[in-house]
């Protein structure tokens, strides 16, 4: 059986509807309207759900997501407030999730009060344990921060600070098919040792010359193949 997954990222919902010079509420509603007409199994949000982390902004986001009555998986970003995010979306935060022969494993790359990401020793140990114990045939890794240079105007110093520590763990496991992240506000795809490395565009605005908003649509196949279609509005 094949599965469909949509990834959105960096919504930056704020109390006054505007952040970074755009109405992030209207933009996200456009994305949700498009997604609500697509038959999918999982919606994944890879961080920065809100801009300042207020409880009211999470409640507003919760209301906006209501039309999408499917499994929702959420990971935090550097703009998120851990306590307020957990208070609103505790049932949606995850470390592992199974989809047939596939497993999605999340790692937390967020540092308190820093824009860039870092994987602590404890986080790497947990990742290694999750990978070693996984009975899935194929694995997706998710985190907020980019794990490779973006080859764009993006400032790579704001990405994951210790990607080599991550790859030292991941390179031991050949079941990993892709790494998905956000943070860079741009669509991009790379490949490393046969593993797809995929950046998701923002629902708010992009940091490159792209003027549209968008999301990534994935199909996970029973044979381990993964296809991606970035959709723009």
UniProtKB/Swiss-Prot annotation:
InterPro entries: Calcineurin-like_PHP_ApaH (IPR004843), CNP_phosphodiesterase-III (IPR050884), Metallo-depent_PP-like (IPR029052). Fe cation 2 binds at residues 48, 78, 144, 183. AMP binds at residues 12, 48, 78-79, 185. Fe cation 1 binds at residues 10, 12, 48, 185. One of its GO terms (molecular function) is nucleotide binding. It is an enzyme of class 3 (hydrolase). Transmembrane segments: none annotated. This is Probable cyclic nucleotide phosphodiesterase COSY_0614. Belongs to the cyclic nucleotide phosphodiesterase class-III family. It comes from the Bacteria. It holds the Pfam family Metallophos. Its cofactor is Fe(2+). Binds 2 Fe(2+) ions per subunit. Keywords: Hydrolase, Iron, Metal-binding, Nucleotide-binding. Its EC number is 3.1.4.-.
